Amino acid sequence: MSFATISVIGLGYIGLPTAAAFASRQKQVIGVDINQHAVDTINRGEIHIVEPDLASVVKTAVEGGFLRASTTPVEADAWLIAVPTPFKGDHEPDMTYVESAARSIAPVLKKGALVILESTSPVGSTEKMAEWLAEMRPDLTFPQQVGEQADVNIAYCPERVLPGQVMVELIKNDRVIGGMTPVCSARASELYKIFLEGECVVTNSRTAEMCKLTENSFRDVNIAFANELSLICADQGINVWELIRLANRHPRVNILQPGPGVGGHCIAVDPWFIVAQNPQQARLIRTAREVNDHKPFWVIDQVKAAVADCLAATDKRASELKIACFGLAFKPNIDDLRESPAMEIAELIAQWHSGETLVVEPNIHQLPKKLTGLCTLAQLDEALATADVLVMLVDHSQFKVINGDNVHQQYVVDAKGVWR
């Protein structure tokens, strides 16, 4: 069965680029999202997120009649579910959005359809999704019931793209294809080859699920080493960035760069999925998460120390001091604030500091709700000219071009080493 019509559930940072990639190959693509604003924006040929090169692809696809968005699912040959999978309680995975998406498409599933889960999920989620679909559609058969002879094929195919490079990596990167059966994997591979230039690497659904969690946990553990090293160096009076540069001259050493913490909806979340399912075995993974989660509070302590030094050296009161936070996004040159340690730090500073807290974030036009009324969104020049204490949190390109020698403030907390 060919894939004449493809539907993507969830039109966020992964779903919309994926929908656009299929539409760019002149496939009929229906994007589904519960966010009416996102749907309306896309149907105008515009985008509601920041991602290089995405706007032009969406505009061309919509104008050509290959991409449209809706708030309700309609019949399609293939479905891709790319909805959030946050955690709840004690870092337990919350599969509510995946279940809701699966149950929303069940009424319009047809024999021969392919359903792919892309959302980062704990091991066994694809099988659980298949159970939800089977529960709602007893008239159809699924892989867990009849194997290769199933009416509906099910697979897990995680994305592995870098925000800011999504439109390139979506097409160029290899793709892990985890079907519930070999037939499911073959059909999923056929679907992705519509736009994929990388290789489709086939495995089973459980291994594919664990693969995505492993990739991000590996990154988290390595970042935790760098962040822990930064704490040690601060106590020892050593420039951690110089230290890492020197250590990395060793041919078999590649230490990552420290920062204010770890953010985003992948690296800051996925390791907990492994810990939740394997609490006794995942001790290193848990410790790395705790190290990275603690880093924002260490940054806050540095800010408090800088403010105390500033007050001691000037005749200003605390309420007269301005603190400027540079960056809110979880990584450079994007507008994604999910799980961002920079935003957490800005919020904590604003709650603690009696004076004005400025925020400079060149990729947004208004503050998120949790910072509205707490902080002031400022331009870069204004913050540099008026703030008493500077806090560098995200190494956006606009910040990196500023020569540290031209920063006149004596009280600087640089969590990214931009002005080192």
UniProtKB/Swiss-Prot annotation:
Q: Name one GO cellular component term.
A: cytosol
Question: Pathway of this protein?
Answer: Bacterial outer membrane biogenesis; enterobacterial common antigen biosynthesis
Keywords, A to Z?
A: NAD, Oxidoreductase
Record's signal peptide: none
From the UniProt record, give one GO term of the biological process aspect. enterobacterial common antigen biosynthetic process
* EC number, as in UniProt: 1.1.1.336
User: What Gene3D superfamilies does its record include?
Assistant: Cytochrome c1, transmembrane anchor, C-terminal, NAD(P)-binding Rossmann-like Domain
What residues bind NAD(+), as annotated? 13-14, 33, 85, 126, 338
Record: active site:
212, 266
What molecular function terms (GO) are annotated for this protein? NAD binding; oxidoreductase activity, acting on the CH-CH group of donors, NAD or NADP as acceptor; protein homodimerization activity; UDP-N-acetyl-D-mannosamine dehydrogenase activity
Q: What happens when the gene is disrupted?
A: Mutants do not synthesize Und-PP-GlcNAc-ManNAcA (lipid II) and enterobacterial common antigen (ECA).
pH-dependent activity: Optimum pH is 10.0.
Recount the known activity regulation: Activated by N-acetylglucosamine-1-P or K(+) at low UDP-ManNAc concentrations.
Q: Which family does it belong to?
A: Belongs to the UDP-glucose/GDP-mannose dehydrogenase family. WecC subfamily.
> How does the annotation summarize its subunit structure?
Homodimer.
Q: What does this protein do?
A: Catalyzes the four-electron oxidation of UDP-N-acetyl-D-mannosamine (UDP-ManNAc), reducing NAD(+) and releasing UDP-N-acetylmannosaminuronic acid (UDP-ManNAcA).
HAMAP family for the chain: WecC_RffD
Q: What is this protein called?
A: UDP-N-acetyl-D-mannosamine dehydrogenase
- Write down the species: Escherichia coli (strain K12)
